[in-house]
Each structure stands twice: as C-alpha cells, then as structure tokens.
Amino acid sequence: MNQTVKVKKKKKTITLGVVHIRASFNNTIVTFTDIQGNTISSASAGGNGFKGARKATPYAAQVTIDRASEKAKEYGLKTISIRIGGPGAQRESAMRALFGQNFVVTSILDVSSIAHNGVRPPKRRRV
C-alpha cells in the first residue's frame, strides 16, 4: 500500500501591517494588508450577513472589523497603521473596534478623497 503524506503549508508571519477602512454611505469594507500592499484578510458588512440599510450601521462596521482582524491575527499581525477613508457614519465605531482588538497602532491617516467640483452629482430624488 502506498501512503501519501500531506505536507502542511506554512503560513507566513507578518508582524507589521496596514488596515484600510472604507466607510461609504452604504457599506463598510475592511482590508488588512502587509507593507507592500498584499492582502492578508478582508471583510465587508454585506459579506457578514448585513443587507440593505443595516450595512451602513456602526454595529455592522464593528462586526466587520472583528471578523477581518481574527483572520489577520492568524498571520501573527501585531502592529498596524490605519488608513481610513469615506464619508460614512461608521468611521468612529470602526476605529473603536480596532482599538479593542489589542493591536499596536503606529499611525492613523485619513485618506478620504475630496472632490474639487469634478463630477456632476446625481439628480434630486423625488418621492
């Protein structure tokens, strides 16, 4: 009888990383990357079971941070730099959830894009 031996794939350990938080009006997307920008883990409020208007709530952002950080901690991530962007109301709760995950935060950077009157906004909604 031939026996096959499964070789376990080694997970690379990453101690320093960047957290990208995109808080839009409709959803929250969280991505953990290494310094070069390679994705370690990512999660979104819609992918965590929140649908419709509940995706844009602060609680959904908190759950999203928790799920993404659990996956990132499996790689040994300890020190993070935070890049947060977007106009959403869930920015503060996402930050608080990150501070509760016992990461060492080196910097917080706001990367929200600011329009210089480039694109015409959509027409007013009539209900």
UniProtKB/Swiss-Prot annotation:
The keyword Ribonucleoprotein applies. Disulfide bonds: none annotated. One of its GO terms (biological process) is translation. PROSITE patterns: RIBOSOMAL_S11. This is Small ribosomal subunit protein uS11. HAMAP family: Ribosomal_uS11. InterPro entries: Ribosomal_uS11 (IPR001971), Ribosomal_uS11_bac-type (IPR019981), Ribosomal_uS11_CS (IPR018102), Ribosomal_uS11_sf (IPR036967). Pfam families: Ribosomal_S11. Located on the platform of the 30S subunit, it bridges several disparate RNA helices of the 16S rRNA. Forms part of the Shine-Dalgarno cleft in the 70S ribosome. Part of the 30S ribosomal subunit. Interacts with proteins S7 and S18. Binds to IF-3. Coiled coil: none annotated. Keywords: Ribonucleoprotein, Ribosomal protein, RNA-binding, rRNA-binding. Belongs to the universal ribosomal protein uS11 family. NCBIfam families: PRK05309.1 (NF003698), uS11_bact (TIGR03632). GO terms for molecular function: rRNA binding; structural constituent of ribosome. GO terms for cellular component: ribonucleoprotein complex; ribosome. The gene is rpsK.
